[in-house]
Each structure stands twice: as structure tokens, then as C-alpha cells.
């Protein structure tokens, strides 16, 4: 399901944005009890889509993406995938860390492949997948599209002073 992604707004008009936003908010309210609290909170917190707020991922730049499989069990045979994305925030005063736990599937299309990177994070939607998991769709300014289906998403804002020691 898509409401506010670019493909849903062919004219990129204010009216399309308002209509899509209203439908997206209604959708999120309808799945509130089915999404994990942190995914729902991230999708509905006011600053997420307030592009003047420094914590918003909009216009952030990808600095790193890690895919790992933490293991447990006697032979490390119990595995699950997780993805961690580290963004340089749009106002260059902090970083955003997104942790996707219990990843079931993902597609990380890069878009333009001229060596110039992903560009800026444009729009994203959090929804419920057909399998009842969290689905996060992220559009990038150079045409990339990420689809990550997971158990949950954790968001952390790291002010630049703190970020220097986290790297």
C-alpha cells in the first residue's frame, strides 16, 4: 500500500499530498493494534514528516548500511537477519540510526548507478505487510527504492557531538 510516495502523486501537487496524507493517517490508525509500538510510534510521531524538524529522515544522506545475522545456540544455528541504516541528517547536526530487527525480506534498489550514491531520503511509508509484519518503503532522490519487511523498527536520533564518538 502506498499513499505518500512519489508514484502516488503523479502531479506532485499539494492536493495529492493532503489527500494521500489523510489516507495514510487513517490507514495507520486502522492497523495501530497490529504494528509493534515502536514502528507505529515512528510512523505517527509528528516530527517524522515535518521536514523542518531536524530529526526527520527527509533529505538525510545514507552513510552506512549493515546487514548482519546475529546467531545463538550451541552451534550458532539460530539466526535472524537485522539491518542497520546510519543517515547523516538533513540539517547536518546529527545522525539517524534505524534498526530493523527480525528481517524477513528486503530489496535495496539503488536507482542511478553513476557512482554518486543514493542521494537524499525523500519519502517513506511504514505499513503492515501481507504476512502481518512491518513493511518500510523508502524512496531516494536518485531513484532508489528500499522495501524492508521486518519484525520491528527502532529509531534513534544521535546529535552530532555524540555521533562523533559512536562511529
Identify the residue ranges that each predicted region occupies.
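Surface-exposed, interaction-prone regions used to assemble/regulate multi-protein complexes
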Residues: 1-167
Amino acid at each position: 500500500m502506498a499513499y505518500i510516495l512519489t508514484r502516488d502523486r503523479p502531479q506532485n501537487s499539494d492536493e495529492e499530498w493532503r489527500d494521500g496524507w489523510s489516507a495514510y493517517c487513517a490507514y495507520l490508525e486502522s492497523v495501530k493494534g497490529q504494528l509493534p509500538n515502536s514502528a507505529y510510534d515512528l510512523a505517527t510521531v509528528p516530527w517524522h514528516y515535518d521536514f523542518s524538524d531536524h530529526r526527520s529522515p527527509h533529505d538525510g544522506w545514507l552513510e552506512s548500511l549493515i546487514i548482519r545475522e546475529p546467531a545463538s545456540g550451541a552451534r550458532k544455528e539460530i539466526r535472524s537477519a537485522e539491518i542497520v541504516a546510519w543517515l547523516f541528517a538533513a540539517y547536518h547536526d546529527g545522525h539517524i540510526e534505524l534498526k530493523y530487527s527480525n528481517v524477513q525480506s528486503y530489496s535495496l534498489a539503488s536507482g542511478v548507478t553513476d557512482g554518486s550514491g543514493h542521494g537524499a531520503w525523500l519519502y517513506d511509508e511504514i505499513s503492515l505487510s501481507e504476512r502481518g509484519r512491518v513493511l518500510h518503503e523508502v524512496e531516494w532522490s536518485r531513484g532508489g527504492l528500499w522495501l524492508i519487511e521486518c519484525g520491528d523498527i527502532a529509531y534513534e536520533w544521535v546529535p552530532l557531538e555524540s555521533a562523533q564518538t559512536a562511529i
